[in-house]
């Protein structure tokens, strides 16, 4: 994770600096990064780091923006979904709510911070893979309240038409994205397995499972934290 945290610091500093300041090595010159070996951001082998990029950096961005008092926590996760069987493989990340800041509400149903990813169009997804996209809607009310509210997350349900191996890596399932300066926290995310009878079974934030044809995964992504009372 050594290079990962440096990129997060540069990203946050770049966002907070005036736009006319050029992005170059000089941005780091005044900074002294103290990250002791063996800590979360600088682990020793054999520490598990499989989600160090996609998950840890989202939490780190929230921490850094909050430390400067600039923004409440966004969803804090990439909501990673991957599935496949003997003839297809697919990977996506699902957007959520952004954190609010002084003078602006959080983004609604968008990837925030260093994500740089887009979802496959529903028509393309269903034509190329044995799945049916049953819901893809805003999760109304999941953003934290405040003078400037946090953004709402999303609900996304994918039903599999063939047996499928599914993996989920997601955060903010137990600890909600925090508000700032009296703003309320956003809602935690949820992962659910829907069986063929439509019964919902809660899943942990990180899980790998085998689904039968006709079963589905529903992901409720976190909302962002609110800013101010």
PLM feature spans:
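Glycine/proline-enriched, intrinsically flexible loops and inter-domain linkers
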Residues: 2-229
